[in-house]
Amino acid sequence: MSTNLRKTHPLAKIINNSFIDLPSPSNISAWWNFGSLLGTCLILQTITGIFLAMHYSPDISLAFSSVAHITRDVQYGWLIRNMHANGASLFFMCIYLHIGRGIYYGSYLYKETWNTGTTLLLLTMATAFVGYVLPWGQMSFWGATVITNLLSAIPYVGNTLVQWIWGGFSVDNATLTRFFTFHFLLPFTIMGLTMMHLLFLHETGSNNPTGLNSNTDKIPFHPYFSYKDLLGLILMLAFLLTLALFFPNLLGDPDNFTPANPLSTPPHIKPEWYFLFAYAILRSIPNKLGGVLALLMSILVLFLMPALHTSKQRTTQFRPLTQILFWSLIANLLVLTWIGGQPVENPFIIIGQMASILYFSILLILMPIAGMIENKMLT
C-alpha cells in the first residue's frame, strides 16, 4: 500500500502537520478563529499593498497626487486602496480580540508563543505607523512629526536619534522614502515571525476554554476547524467589504484629504483609532520622557503577563473576581480610546489620567492579587 504523499513529501508534510492533520482540542470556541483571520489579513494586506506600491511614488511632490491617481485612474485602484486602508483597521480589531482571548483564557502561559505574539504586535504597530505617513496628507505629516519627535525625550542621544530617523532636520523627502522602504519590508518580517509563532504554538498545541490538558480529546484540524474558520473568514470579508464599499472613510481622518503642509498645524493631531488608547496614556503624563515610557509600557506590559499569573487555574472561565477585572480592563481601554480622540482640556485630561492609572493597576497589581485571593477561596 502506497503512503499518502501529503504525509511523506518534505514540504507537504509541514503543511499537513500545521493545517490538516493538526491535533486540535475538540472544545475550542469561535475565539480561536482569530489566528487564521489574522493570517488572512496579513496575506490580504500584502497583496493589496504590493498592487498599491506598483502605482505609488515615494516623493513628497508626488505622493499625495499618486494616491489620488490610484483612486481615480487605476483599474479598481479605489477598491484596492479602500481595502488596504480598512484592512489595517480590521487587522487591529482581530489582533486586539486575539490578545483579549489570550488574556482571558490564560494562553500567555505558553511563554514563547506569547512573546513572539507580542513582538508581532509591536512590528504590526510600527508597520501601520509608517504606512499612515505614505499618503502625505496633513495628518500623515504631523503624525510622523509628533511621534518621531517623542524619541527626542531619550536622554543624551535623543535629538541625534530623531535627526537620524528623519534623515535631516525635519520630516522631509528622505523620511518619506525610508518610511516607504520600512512599510514594504516589515510585513515580510512579520510573516517570518508568524511562522515562528505557529512553530512555538504547535510545540505545545492549542489551549482551550477550560485551560485543562486536552491531549486525551483531540480532533484533526481539517475538516472540523478548517470549515469553522471558513465561516469566520466569510464574516470577516463581508465586514471588510461593507466597510470598504459603503463607508470607506469612516475610520480615516478628514485632515488627510489635505496635502501635507509644514506651515499649518491641524487643530487636533491624533493617530488612527487603533493607537488612541496608547496615545491617551502618552498624553496623560505631563512629562515628555515619562509619557514616552508610559506609552512603551502600555504595550510592553504584555511581556510581563506570564510572570504576573498567580492563580492555580489557567483560565478566567471559573474565576469571578478576575472576570470582573478583565471586563473592567476592556471598558477602561474603550474609555482610553475615546479620550485619545478628544482635545486636551478638562474633563478629558483627568479622565485620561485616571483611566491610565487604572489600566496599569489592573494588569500589574489587581489581577495578581485577585488570583491569590481566589486561590485562598479554593482551599
Swiss-Prot record:
A ubiquinone binds at H202. The keyword Electron transport applies. Heme b b562 binds at H84, H183. Heme b b566 binds at H98, H197. The keyword Disulfide bond does not apply. Its cofactor is heme b. Heme 1 (or BL or b562) is low-potential and absorbs at about 562 nm, and heme 2 (or BH or b566) is high-potential and absorbs at about 566 nm. Component of the ubiquinol-cytochrome c reductase complex (complex III or cytochrome b-c1 complex) that is part of the mitochondrial respiratory chain. The b-c1 complex mediates electron transfer from ubiquinol to cytochrome c. Contributes to the generation of a proton gradient across the mitochondrial membrane that is then used for ATP synthesis. The cytochrome bc1 complex contains 3 respiratory subunits (MT-CYB, CYC1 and UQCRFS1), 2 core proteins (UQCRC1 and UQCRC2) and probably 6 low-molecular weight proteins. PANTHER family: CYTOCHROME B. This is Cytochrome b.
